[in-house]
Amino acid sequence: MNLYLFTFKFLYLLAGVLVNNFPRLSLGLYNRAIDVYLKKGLNFDFIEILLDIAINLDILGMKDQAVQSYKKAIEINPNEARAYYGLAIIYDDNREFSKAIEFYQKAIELDPYYSKAYFFMANAFDENGQKQEAAQYYEKAAELDPTHFWAFNNLAAVYEETGQYDKALAAIRKGLELEPEHFKALFNAGVIMNRLGYPRKAVEYYRQSLERNPRYSYTYLNLSLIHLEEKDYQKAVEVISKGIKYVPEASFLYYNRACFYVHLDMYDLAVKDLIIASDMSRELEEYMWNDRELDPLRDLKLYKEHFKATVS
């Protein structure tokens, strides 16, 4: 093998190995490989180099340079679907969803079997509040890759949000077939079961979810709200208190426990939790002013002292 070609390939392959753990070193090796490539006129696919460098630049947070590298690849080959996909990912990360969707669509026009592009385009539609389009493309991603757990999981969540509970149940069952132990799928199954009017099944799924991940705060919230609906306020407090133990930074858990304490006439404890929640979250503090559930607290001395001071 030509010595220069060997050197180029060594640098190029080593850069690829190091890209995730040592992206800056990897980028330096790619640049050295390009230097050899350009000086010696080696026969190698330059687009592959540009795409790899763009990925490196993106990992390093050098978004503008990554965009230029992807665009250079497109100049060389306007039909390079991966370059459009890479651009879409960058705009997606910047929450420029409309622009990201435009590039995802271009990628799948060029490669109709690009399952990752369908999935992330669905996610961009989802984040942008376009639930119908999100469902359409999650379905396509799942069709192209029937082992794509997140396509089924996210599809179930979208169907649940749009009130299509039977479709949501079918999707989450497929997700659980792929990953029966995944806490998020078990959580979503709990949400869907409760929506369908099966609170006991929902409780079962939520408990399984907590066994897999005791630090997912929304599971405690949803489980406690089922007990609230059943007027088992003590059990609701017990569940949400456990959530606070595992996720003490979740302000909404304190807020909801305050509401549960109100139902138990434990007003002093309710005010203390409300103070913690409002200190942690300006949004919750603003919300509480119009929350009628908290009206029994408003004449209490501790409530007046703290929240009058907050207002003034």
Predicted feature residues:
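Canonical positions in the second alpha-helix
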Residues: A33, A73, K106-A107, K140-A141, ...
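Canonical tetratricopeptide repeat
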Residues: L13, D52, G86, F120, ...
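Register position in tetratricopeptide repeats
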Residues: N20, I59, D93-N94, E127-N128, ...
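Structural marker of alpha-solenoid helical repeat scaffolds
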Residues: V36, K40-L42, I76, L110, ...
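Helix-start (N-cap) detector for alpha-helical repeat units in TPR-like alpha-solenoids
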Residues: F8, I47-E48, A81-R82, S115-K116, ...
